[in-house]
A protein has these predicted regions:
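Alpha-helical transmembrane segments of multi-pass membrane proteins
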Residues: 4, 21-725
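N-terminal intrinsically disordered, low-complexity tails
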Residues: 9-20
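N-terminal acidic, proline/glycine-rich, low-complexity intrinsically disordered segments
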Residues: 1-10
């Protein structure tokens, strides 16, 4: 290995090579790790590098997942387009991490530039936020669609995607340069442990409604610890700038942060309403019940004999609809609101003080989950403007309220109504006739007769109320809904995309995904070199794509069974990582003589998940539902990771193999949009097909592994890893 200094004389024993003044100046500015000698990573010993290096890898993995989660939350709150492109930031993250792993042995070390990239991305977003979403068609309805502010979609989305990929490339390269010093499974184990701590830390911050300033401070501290005395003045200045930008923004904006939204509370208007915006979109206005339009009270006036002994309000928000129910004489109200911060605003700012009433019981929960957990019967169930304006967890195309509007959800609500006189009502600014008709038809199918339908306002500001009863005689309709010839069928729990006008992938999604794939191909080739170095790991690529779909299926399954709350999603992701860790620990100790059996077991687990529809578990009580859901969802995940780890344990190049798997996960994130056509259950078929491709492309490796494992060591504790275990 040659020195970069012009002085070729060997350095004295026990001392570092002397550096030329220009190089010392560069190190002072940019840090001592920016330039790496060719092949330095390749020359690193592989084995047990020691506690300090183990801690470094775990800390790097913590940073990687923590920053990924922070970017998903923060960018989605400031760039409204991202609230509707479900996994846009996630795709950019996987691309970046994959490229970073492919660069593990590059001469130029990009990891020290992470603070600079983060500071630039933060400054750009704060300078050019997008406050209102915009679409150019009617295939997908965004209730928040008003008009565009900020940079246009065609410019903002590519910039954000490339910026996220750049940041995660730098962090991923830092992980990879340490990852390569370990045996593959030892490195993977530390990576998973760091990731588990990362998701636990971010979930804790979400629980305490921490602002982005806290996320930035933790990121800066971890980067300082990882850099140590090798940090350069530019990196230090960038970290200071990052903290300064987030501090200034926190002091100026006075935004509140819930686990779901960036919440902005406006000043009281002349009409004595208080506007509330989430993620830069007008969401609701806190208004006194006496000043609300009469149409909000139609569910009560159309059923004058309803005793209103028990009322359920789903989407209780800041309390407007709860106050309205109290005003109309409700004796007891269960108010369900998913966002704890929105609820707290209602307790403080609503002049009617509905949440302080002894007749009101507040529940911070998902509406569908509450219905599945209660046995109460209600005289009135009201879905009051349940429009989340956000998606679940940055993964899958679910919105927080998706499972409220399916046929099965309305049937569940009907089952909770008092026989004979119970009334169900829902209202919102539906903004398009086909959507209102679709929901009215859903009520018609669930109740067996057409609902009452009333509207006020025009165009996108038209407020519509749909009211129906168990018995047609229980309500007095001024206008009864009439089914048009071209009405769309009700959405279902398997295909819960009520805002999608047809079972297709909207054209703007197709265009965006196509450009993402094209950009990814170009970036991987340009930054990381020829594709041929990954050809030997095609099976790992397909495993990554399949596993991403399995993870998505788990998220949506638990969202249906236990609610779309942030806490449920955090538990699912933590559960996935724990299942992965269990597979790693198993493969570190046990060699499977016939990996083909693992594929067979995985196929059987997928078949069980197919045979037992997720909605069939809703009839069970919470504990048996949870046990069966965990078994059905996590058995395939555990077996899939046994397949992966048995293959990964003996790879010749762990970072390239891991990169192939990560890029496969990105491809899986693109394939996930097929669910808009097929529904989520059909993803199991796609998963089975992808693992079939992994089996076919990896047959030679399976044969070689079997030949190497023949003998008494098979299916016994592995001797090669004894020292590290």
């Amino acid at each position: 290995m040659t020195s970069d200094s012009s002085d070729s004389r060997p350095a004295p024993a026990g001392s570092e090579p002397r550096q030329s003044p220009p190089r010392r100046a560069l190190e002072w500015l940019f840090g001592r790790d920016v330039l790496t000698s060719p092949g330095a990573a390749a020359e690193s010993p592989v084995g047990d590098p020691g506690r300090s290096v183990q801690l470094r890898l775990a800390l790097l993995s913590f940073l990687m997942l923590f920053v990924e989660l922070a970017l998903i939350r923060w960018l989605g709150a400031n760039i409204v387009y991202l609230s509707y492109y479900s996994n846009f930031v996630l795709l950019g993250s996987f691309l970046g991490i994959g490229i970073g792993f492919l660069r593990a042995r590059s001469r130029i070390n990009l990891f020290p530039w992470t603070p600079v990239a983060l500071a630039l991305l933060t400054a750009f977003v704060l300078r050019f936020p997008v406050q209102i979403s915009h679409t150019s068609g009617t295939q997908l309805i965004f209730f928040g669609a008003l008009k565009t502010t900020g940079l246009p979609t065609w410019l903002m989305l590519p910039v954000i995607f490339l910026a996220v990929a750049a940041v995660m490339t730098m962090i991923g390269e830092g992980v990879a340069r340490t990852f390569v010093q370990f045996k593959p499974l030892d490195a993977y184990r530390l990576d998973i442990l760091g990731s588990i701590v990362g998701i636990a830390a971010f979930s804790t911050l979400s629980f305490f409604n921490a602002k982005p300033l806290a996320w930035g401070i933790i990121t800066a501290i971890v980067l300082l610890v990882l850099s140590g005395t090798r940090i350069g003045i530019i990196q230090f200045a960038a970290l200071a700038s990052l903290a300064g930008l987030l501090t200034a923004n926190s002091l100026i904006s006075h935004d509140l942060w819930s686990p779901y939204y960036r919440i902005t509370v406006g000043a009281r208007t002349q009409a004595q309403t208080i506007p509330v915006m989430v993620n830069g979109i007008p969401h609701q206005a806190i208004t006194a019940a006496a000043k609300r339009p009469a149409i909000f009270y139609q569910p009560y006036t159309q059923a004058p004999r309803n005793p209103l002994n028990n009322v359920l309000v789903v989407g209780a928000g800041t309390g407007n609809d709860v106050a309205g129910a109290l005003r109309m004489g409700a004796k007891h109200i269960d108010a369900v609101e998913i966002d704890p911060m929105i609820y707290k605003l209602g307790t403080k700012l609503n002049s009617d003080r509905p949440y302080q009433s002894p007749r009101v019981s507040a529940h911070i929960n998902d509406g569908r989950a509450f219905l599945s957990q209660t046995k109460k019967k209600y005289d009135l169930i009201l879905f009051a403007l349940p429009d989340s304006l956000t998606l679940v967890a940055g993964q899958s195309s679910l919105r927080l309220e998706s499972y409220l509007f399916t046929l099965q959800a309305i049937q569940s609500a009907r089952a909770h109504l008092v026989p004979g006189t119970g009334v169900f009502a829902m209202y919102n600014y539906y903004r398009t006739t086909w959507l209102k008709d679709r929901l009215a038809d859903t009520l018609d199918v669930a109740f067996g007769h057409a609902p009452c339908a009333s509207s006020v306002g025009q165009h996108q500001q038209q407020l519509s109320v749909l009211t129906v009863s168990v018995s047609p005689a229980a309500v007095r309709c001024v206008n009864t809904w009439h089914r048009p010839a071209n009405v769309l069928p009700p959405s279902t729990d398997d295909h819960p995309f009520v805002y999608l006008a047809s079972n297709t992938i909207p054209s703007f999604y197709l265009l965006t995904l196509g450009l993402i794939l094209l950009a990814s191909l170009v970036l991987v080739r340009t930054v990381s070199g020829p594709y041929r170095k990954m050809t030997g790991f095609a099976d790992l690529f397909f495993m990554g794509a399949a596993f991403m779909l399995l993870e998505t299926k788990s998220v949506v399954q638990f969202a249906l069974l236990f609610g779309t709350t942030w806490f449920v999603n955090a538990l699912v992701f933590a559960g996935v990582l724990i299942a992965v860790l269990a597979a790693v620990e198993t493969s570190r100790r046990v060699v499977i003589r016939r990996p083909q059996l693992l594929y067979a077991g995985l196929l059987a687990a997928l078949a069980v998940a197919w045979v037992v529809p997720q909605e069939s578990l809703l009839s069970l009580s919470v504990i048996p539902r949870f046990v069966l859901a965990v078994l059905i969802a996590f058995a395939p995940i555990f077996l899939a990771n046994l397949v992966f780890t048995q293959r990964f344990r003996d790879v010749s190049d762990s970072t390239v193999a891991f990169a192939a798997n990560l890029l496969g996960a990105m491809a899986g994130g693109v394939i996930e949009y097929v669910s808009l056509i097929t529904g989520y259950r059909a993803l199991l078929i796609v998963v089975a097909g992808l693992y079939g491709l992994a089996f076919l492309t990896g047959r030679r490796k399976l044969t070689a592994a079997k030949a190497a494992q023949e003998g008494p060591a098979a299916l016994a504790p592995t001797t090669a890893l004894t020292a590290s275990t």
